């Protein structure tokens, strides 16, 4: 009887070790529902997040957090004004001393 219990426990552990997590939601969900083409003043930015495409969202998302009120705006990565903003921010970071 003891050997049977050990064998059953081993089979259960081997079976459970092969189970992998499956996401509950299979829908595509992006953080940004709507995007803005309006230019943003770099001085009014608190934080700028760039979220690359993933399995959950096929688009590049750029989220700007503003200094006043902590408002978050989704920016259009294809907009010329936003491309200029990204360039200005990256140049500012590269000039910053380590």
Swiss-Prot record:
| A single GO BP | chemotaxis
Location of the protein in the cell: Secreted
List the PROSITE patterns hit by this protein, alphabetically. SMALL_CYTOKINES_CXC
Per the UniProt entry, the disulfide pairs are 30-57, 32-74
The alphabetized UniProt keywords are:
Chemotaxis, Citrullination, Cytokine, Disulfide bond, Inflammatory response, Secreted, Signal
Q: Name one GO molecular function term.
A: CXCR3 chemokine receptor binding
Signal sequence, renumbered to the chain: 1-21
Per the entry, what this protein does is: Chemotactic for monocytes and T-lymphocytes. Binds to CXCR3.
The protein's name is C-X-C motif chemokine 10
What is the protein's species of origin? Macaca nemestrina
The organism's taxonomy opens as: Eukaryota, Metazoa, Chordata, Craniata, Vertebrata
């Amino acid at each position: 009887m003891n050997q049977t219990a050990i064998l059953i426990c081993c089979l259960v552990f081997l079976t459970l070790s092969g189970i992998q997590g499956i996401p509950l939601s299979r829908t595509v969900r992006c953080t940004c529902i709507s995007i803005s083409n309006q230019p943003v003043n770099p001085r009014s930015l608190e934080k700028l997040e760039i979220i690359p495409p993933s399995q959950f969202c096929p688009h590049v998302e750029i989220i700007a957090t503003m200094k006043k009120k902590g408002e978050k705006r989704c920016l259009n990565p294809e907009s010329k004004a936003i491309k200029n903003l990204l360039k200005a921010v990256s140049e500012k970071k590269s000039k910053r001393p380590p």
